[in-house]
Every structure is written in structure tokens, then in C-alpha cells.
Swiss-Prot record:
GO CC terms, sorted: cytoplasm
Subcellular location: Cytoplasm
Gene3D superfamilies xref list: P-loop containing nucleotide triphosphate hydrolases, RecF/RecN/SMC, N-terminal domain
Family membership noted in the UniProt record: Belongs to the RecF family.
Job description of the protein: The RecF protein is involved in DNA metabolism; it is required for DNA replication and normal SOS inducibility. RecF binds preferentially to single-stranded, linear DNA. It also seems to bind ATP.
Keyword Ion transport: no
Binding site for ATP: G30, A31, N32, G33, S34, G35, K36, T37
Protein name: DNA replication and repair protein RecF
HAMAP family: RecF
Alphabetized GO MF terms: ATP binding; single-stranded DNA binding
Amino acid sequence: MSLRRIMVTAVRNLHPVTLLPSPRINILYGANGSGKTSVLEAVHLLGLARSFRSTRLNPVIQYEQAACTVFGEVQLTEGGTSNLGVSRERQGEFTIRIDGQNARQAQLAELLPLQLINPDSFRLLEGAPKIRRQFLDWGVFHVEPRFLPAWQRLQKALRQRNSWLRHGTLDPASQAAWDRELCLRSAEIDEYRRNYIKALKPVFERTLSELVELDGLTLSYYRGWDKDRELQEVLASSLLRDQQMGHTQAGPQRADLRLRLAGNNAADILSRGQQKLVGMRIIAQGHLVSQARRGHCIYLVDDLPSELDDQHRRALCRLLEELRCQVFITCVDHELLREGWQTETPVALFHVEQGRITQTHDHRE
């Protein structure tokens, strides 16, 4: 799976452009502030209908423009193509289209799986549990088709219970029914996550060993409540506290991934450079998605040279190359990446200057 064509209109400072990227390696280079990251942001918008730089989409829309639009032609793994389009108006209207039909965000994400590697990747270690849950659930979503409907039912049950905790609006029978639904969906989500982590751990360890030597680094999964107790029991025993807090404290919404080194929190021991390398391990998820979907992720790698020394930069390039996936990489000096690829790997170069994009090397040549 890869993007054959990308059309970008009114995204930040970018001039309207049509890109014909390589199915493998694409390097966007230029001075800081030229618009390189905005290209990655446009691809991210196309695949996830949201920006990785801002929780609000209005700043993404170019100044004095009414809307921004990104269109993509996707080469499907099984053959054929699919056309995707995402448009956001300044007044708030959001349109997602797949092959001419209105679509939902989840359909978009399923069709175009993206992985982002940027200077914030190390936040997987030192950031809040929510960041690690999002990382975990991205992978589960792409390998387990039953996950999304189960997660949606869980969220509905959780909203009902939290509303009752705050306002006491449910009768005892309704409260018991929603608690049962919450427990059933929690067990289902927990099973999908555990199965995924079981498959991820050996891939994670192998991938990490190719980037950095960290003997004894372990990855474990906390499901969000005591592993030796049923959730129903935990909910009953914590009911008074939940009512005082106004929300449910135990359950899958409190799950976390834990990285430990020599029995300690890895974020407390590892240097910032080591944390960045461990953060790069998200490549491991691409292996699992490729196996489950018989297709490939698309990787967005922002400012790679500044984050790694030459040795680890080459190691990361080698891992990305071995995945045989499509990659978009930004950098200031493309010469730092010129020697990172095999001669048979098709590499396209794009120079970005003040929002204008010029292809300086065509992968087809």
C-alpha cells in the first residue's frame, strides 16, 4: 500500500501542489520553516483526519483561505487504487470522502495506516498513560477488526456510568445493566490488548536490539485494574470513591504500557538520547500490521537527522528499508541521508522553499 498521488491545497504555508511520490523512500529537504513538516501534516490529515501539530484544525487552514483540502490516490496491496479526500472548512465543517462516498474517520484510518516518528516520539516513555494507550490501541485497531465496535460500546457504557456517578440519574436496575455491559466490554478490550502485546513483545525486542543495546528492558501491560480481581468486584468496592470523584477509576480507560529497566521506570534511568531510540521502536508495530493486513504502513519521519547520530540514523534507515514500506522523511540537509539506502531502493527528493515544493530527483529515473 502506498500513496501514488497527493494533492494539497491551502494547508498552512504550502502553495497548491501535486506530488508523485516514490512507493518507497521520499525525502523532503529545505531550511527550517520552509514547510517540510506541513507536507507530513497534510499526509497525516489525509490518513487520520487530524493534525499531529495542533488539536485545533483552524490553524492548519492557510491564512485568508476558507478551507484546506488534501486528496490522495492510494495504490492498494491487492491491486487497484482508491481515492481519498479530506476537507476542512474554517467554519468547522469536515468532509471525508472515499471513492466519491462520504466516510467516517475510522474508515479512513483503516484504509491508510500511518505511523509518525518525530521529536516527540520519546514521550511514549515519559508522557502520560493516555499517550501509551493511544499507541497501543492504534496497533490493536489495525490487527483486530472486532476492536473498534467493542471500544465504542465500552465508551457508551462508561459515559452512562460516569453520568450516574455525578448525577444519580439511573435506577438500580439500569445501573446494574450498564455495569454488566461495562464489565463485558472491558473484558473483551482487555483480551484484544493482551493478545496484541503478546505478539508485539518479541518484535519490539528484536527491533530495539537493532537500534540500541539495553539489556533488561522489559515491556509489560497493565490492564487498568487488579489482575487478580474481576472488574465487577473492583467497581463495587470502589463505588463510594467513584461517586466522590465523579468518574470510574478502574477499567480499560486506565490501561498503560510499562517499560522497565532493572526493575525501575525506564524513563527515570535512560538518557534523553536513549529515550528517543526506544521511542523509535514504534516501527515494530509496522511489522504486525503488515502481517495482519498483508499490507504496509506509511511512515512519516520528521527531522530524522537532528534526532540521531550517524550510526543510529543508518540503523533506522535500514529498518525502514527492510519493511519495504512507503516513507516520507524531512530534513534540512538531504546529503545526511543520501548514503542510507540500497542502490535498488527507489528514492524521490523534494526541495521545499517558502512553501513551494520542487521534485529534484524522480524515483522513476
